[in-house]
Swiss-Prot record:
It catalyses: 2 NADH + O2 + 2 H(+) = 2 NAD(+) + 2 H2O. Keywords: FAD, Flavoprotein, NAD, Oxidation, Oxidoreductase, Redox-active center. Catalyzes the four-electron reduction of molecular oxygen to water. Gene3D superfamilies: 3.30.390.30, FAD/NAD(P)-binding domain. The keyword Methyltransferase does not apply. FAD binds at residues 10, 12, 34-35, 44, 81, 110, 113, 143, 170, 292, 309-311, 436. This is NADH oxidase. Belongs to the class-III pyridine nucleotide-disulfide oxidoreductase family. Its cofactor is FAD. SUPFAM superfamilies: FAD/NAD(P)-binding domain, FAD/NAD-linked reductases, dimerisation (C-terminal) domain.
Length: 456
């Protein structure tokens, strides 16, 4: 029997553990260490909880220690791993306040990521805090269930009237909406001059920016935060251009991979993530890394990349589980497919934006089209959809796609995700069999029309 130690039990770790136990039973001994008090919190639901769009956090968990142990794992919660001896193959963790040494045959890192702490005066985390507790009251980081619960409790204080959200990526934009729905004044700050810049081209980010402004969110794009000021608690946030009187500051500038346990022994990617192959194996044989702490193969760029998404965490966990248990399995790569819904504006994307494709050296072009989902004689449930398809002019290969609408058209992006994965050309997409029925779409579907419009 082989002993497999898993460090971390959130999305990637949970998927990995369940895959090993349900597919290989008691063929292996599975031991798990996690520094948190809970597992499987769906951080994507944090904004829904804060904005009172769901009743409470109970549905944001899908597994727990008891379930994993019922399947056969030994799980140590609130037990941070202190060190790893890769030669002796031992893991030392702090269990109930005492050092606990566990041997292993295979090791799987699912250590995730942690919030980026930007060089901002006044923005500091308390020494030794595992829950990203700031030294300044009402300066909040967003990662764990505990962070969300803390923010929600503080929002009951009627003195907190104005909130600044720093970072206009997915999390920042969702939280800005949530605080406004909660009745707070909101200012959204980002050093870039738009929002969601990593996922959409400028015309669609402008659409989202206008959407937020129409709902009362103050946008402060193109501003660099210099200081969070206050006497013991947040009182104002200072940028290179303005000062804003606020009662709470949320830092949502992104996450960095948590790879400190590599201890200089494991090869790292340029951003510090564990560098892995398609089996999720690191540079040390028998040591795997999954989820936000690891790299992943990007089918759009056809190269190794870092794309921190819960969907990727689950897939990498499954791949590592089979390999650690002796079944040779390679991941097929990802496209970074994602989506967002703010005040009823739905946007989805996959692969590369035009701007990013050009920055990476592709001779890229875009074809775009806006049309109603259904024929005009369908008077109800009809809505306009905007689509953009990015492709390489040399190979004609589809590199990315973006869609926006006021109704749910999200399933369409999966076609483009598969197209990027399989190297489909823009010409082949134009001839793809897309059915027509007026209840659903037009004879010339907007996907077909956009593909036919590719002239370069």
């Amino acid at each position: 029997m082989s002993k497999i130690v898993v460090v971390g039990a959130n999305h990637a770790g949970t998927a990995c553990i369940k895959t090993m136990l349900t597919n290989y039973g008691d063929a292996n001994e599975i031991v798990v260490f996690d520094q948190n008090s809970n597992i499987s919190f769906l951080g994507c639901g944090m904004a829904l909880w804060i904005g009172e769009q769901i009743a409470g956090p109970e549905g944001l968990f899908y597994s727990d220690k008891e379930e994993l142990e019922s399947l056969g794992a030994k799980v140590y919660m609130e037990s941070p791993v202190q060190s790893i001896d890769y030669d002796a193959k031992t893991v030392t963790a702090l269990v109930d306040g005492k050092n606990h040494v566990e041997t292993y045959d295979k090791l799987i890192f699912a250590t995730g990521s942690q919030p980026i702490l930007p060089p901002i005066k006044g923005a500091e985390i308390k020494e030794g805090s595992l829950e990203f507790e700031a030294t300044l009251e009402n300066l909040q980081f967003v990662k764990l269930y505990q962070n969300s619960a803390d923010v929600i409790a503080k929002l009951e204080n009627k003195d907190i009237k104005r909130v600044a959200v720093v970072g206009a990526g997915y999390i920042g934009v969702e939280l800005a909406e949530a605080f406004q729905r909660k009745g707070k004044e909101v200012v959204l700050i980002d050093v870039v001059d738009t929002c969601l810049a990593g996922y959409y081209d400028r015309d669609l980010t402008d659409l989202m920016a206008k959407n937020m402004e129409e709902h009362g969110i103050q946008l402060a794009f193109g501003e660099t935060v210099k200081e969070v000021a206050g006497n013991g608690k947040v009182e104002k946030i200072i940028t290179d251009k303005n000062e804003y009187d606020v009662d709470m500051v949320i830092l949502a500038v992104g996450f960095r991979p948590n790879t400190t346990l590599g201890n200089g022994k494991i090869d790292l990617f340029r951003n510090g993530a564990f560098l892995v192959n398609k089996r999720q194996e690191t540079s040390i044989p028998g040591v795997y890394a999954i989820g936000d702490c690891a790299t992943i193969y990007d089918n759009a760029t056809r190269d190794t990349n870092y794309i921190a998404l819960a969907s990727n965490a689950v897939r990498t966990g499954i791949v590592a589980a089979h390999n650690a248990c002796g079944t040779d399995l390679e991941g097929i790569g990802v496209q970074g497919s994602n989506g967002i819904s703010i005040y009823g504006l739905h946007m989805v994307s996959t692969g590369l934006t035009l701007e990013k494709a050009k920055r990476l050296g592709f001779d890229a072009a875009v074809t775009e089209y806006t049309d109603n989902q259904k024929p005009e004689f369908i008077e109800h449930g009809n809505f306009p959809v905007t689509i953009k398809i990015v492709y390489d002019k040399d190979s004609r290969r589809i590199l990315g796609a973006q869609m926006a609408a006021r109704e749910d058209m999200s399933m369409g992006i999966h076609m483009f995700s598969l197209a990027i994965q399989e190297g489909v050309t823009i010409e082949k997409l134009a001839l793809t069999d897309i059915f027509f029925l007026p209840h659903f779409n037009k004879p010339y579907n907007y996907i077909t029309m956009a593909a036919l419009g590719a002239k370069d």
